[in-house]
């Protein structure tokens, strides 16, 4: 059965390999991930029409781009299950870094927006957040394009390179992705500082997601460059190690970031108004305080009596010992005529 599988499928034999079932297991997880990601995309598109809070809505286009990138990661898993050849090698070396760069750039853009929101500032527009995500990933696209073009045109094909060369080049191509990952990690930590508590839950989701991603990347890079050669499992374990890390990280993106974000959006849509706390109470207080200060300034330009009333209403309360008991029955704004004064006596 195993020999028939190899002879009939060639480079695709891992898709039906029952003796080494890692290909079948990862294939099943990737297909399930594709289905779940499509359902989450439809859920986000449905909820986009019901979100009333602009601060929440502005990040949704970037999250849709993030979901499309995760969908691409699950599809890319098949390029690692299939044997390395002239067709799968360029796809691996180009899309792996580009798709992960898009994912971490989207997380970075969201975290950067949260840094403003937790401090009571106004959110970036949705175009600004989306441009940050796309702009941060452009460098990885340029790097991957140049590398694949050079390999394909200079005569040294991927299949002619040694496993050690392939692995080193693969990791070196991902240096910028590692930088994006580290930057997103530190920016997400900055979202923990600020008076608006409700926005911090989004920052915690990004922080935990990136933390698990860092652990996954440290493990698979260590195995690819050091572990497999030491265990004398190179190149047999090279593709399984990278593919397992790819599928695992894609599921981490869904379970630790997208699903909780979708739950938050759903709770927000069930309320009649945006989530309490999204409009930071500190900001509202500061705004009202500024309005009161402006009214005080206008009062100082008017007559002295009006100024005294304004200061009594908005300023520091008058201490009891400073009040003259003989003045308690008089209203400062009104001036009584002599006739009214005599009648009152």
UniProtKB/Swiss-Prot annotation:
InterPro entries: GPCR_3_C, RA-inducible_GPCR3
Keywords (A to Z) from UniProt: Cell membrane, G-protein coupled receptor, Membrane, Receptor, Transducer, Transmembrane, Transmembrane helix
Membrane topology: Multi-pass membrane protein
Subcellular location: Cell membrane
Principal location class: membrane
Gene Ontology terms, MF aspect: G protein-coupled receptor activity; protein kinase activator activity
Tissue localization of expression: Widely expressed in the peripheral system. Expression pattern is high in pancreas, medium in kidney, small intestine, spleen and testis, low in lung, colon, leukocyte, prostate and thymus and not detectable in brain, heart, liver, placenta, skeletal muscle and ovary.
Transmembrane annotation, as ranges: 28-48, 64-84, 94-114, 124-144, 168-188, 205-225, 240-260
Stretches in topological domain Cytoplasmic: 49-63, 115-123, 189-204, 261-345
Domain of life: Eukaryota
Intervals, Extracellular compartment: 1-27, 85-93, 145-167, 226-239
Pfam families: 7tm_3
GO CC, alphabetical: extracellular exosome; intracellular membrane-bounded organelle; plasma membrane; receptor complex
Keyword Membrane: yes
Function field: G-protein coupled receptor involved in hard keratin expression and likely plays a role in the development of hair and nails.
Family assignment from sequence similarity: Belongs to the G-protein coupled receptor 3 family.
Quaternary structure and interacting proteins, as annotated: Homodimer.
Protein's recorded name: G-protein coupled receptor family C group 5 member D
